Amino acid sequence: ELPIFAFTHCRDVVVAVSRAGGIGVLGAAGFTPEQLGQELDWISARLGDKPFGIDVIMPKKFESGDVPDLQSMIPERHKAWVEEVLARHGVAPLPADAGAGAHHGISGEQIGWTHELCRRLLDVAFGYPGVKVMVNALGTPPADVLAECRERGILVGALAGKVKHALAHRQ
């Protein structure tokens, strides 16, 4: 009804915006697939047939890879700098058994940056008829995701940091 989109991690905001005629878009990267299903159940129960969206973080260039691969890509000097900043400000280190994604609030899971992890989130989201928009925070999604969205009648949006990115999205 209105050209208003609200990107949020808060299900209450998704519902409020969609009820008001806009499109509430839930940021999914911080959830496990199970948690996302619970959030989408809650949203769907309150919106009925009103549309809403899901926002993922899926790099087109990383169509495979697991958490250790991504962790190994972080330069040691960056890790040392983060540790120094945390120590300087008195932030306690995480317990050794906290899991790879604990700093994102995800027990034992990496934030959904890989194709595999993000696909699991999308598989959950695509099971909800109210999901009418899928937005990728890292540009054009991989071809298989675009194809599935088209097949399901789901609109696709993507971040465009430069004009060349916006032009690429048109294709």
Please tell me what each predicted stretch does:
Residues 1-171:
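Active-site entrance/lid segments in N-terminal catalytic domains of soluble metabolic enzymes
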